Regions:
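An alpha-helical, amphipathic repeat domain used for nucleic-acid recognition
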Residues: 1-106
């Protein structure tokens, strides 16, 4: 699979596999996991990249949601599951619990 990227609006970067849209991430995540434009990647590399992109998206969503109001762990995870996978949502929630921004009991 040939991976190419294209700058989007703001800080977005659009990723394409074999010329077809595949995912969107932000510049920071892309720079942390950079793969040169036109690189030939296998399915394993693509899946690893998607895991990192989804985790970063989950962290960003947590920050956004918690900046608006307090959430219980269950509420936040339920909200995250609307836009990211279960593993990424749980890892992001765990990270915010460790950092002291989220508590099981209020």
């Amino acid at each position: 699979m040939i991976l190419t990227h294209q700058k989007g609006r703001g800080t977005k970067v659009h990723l394409f596999l074999d010329g077809e849209y595949a995912a969107t991430t932000d510049e920071n995540c892309w720079l942390d996991n950079y793969i040169s434009n036109g690189a030939d990647i296998d399915d394993e590399q693509w899946q690893a990249l998607l895991v990192k992109i989804n985790y970063k998206k989950a962290l960003n969503k947590c920050a956004d949601y918690l900046s608006r109001r307090d959430y219980s762990v269950k509420e936040l995870k339920t909200k995250l599951l609307k836009s990211v996978d279960e593993v990424s949502a749980q890892k992001a929630v765990d990270r915010y619990i460790e950092a002291g921004y989220l508590f099981y009991l209020k």
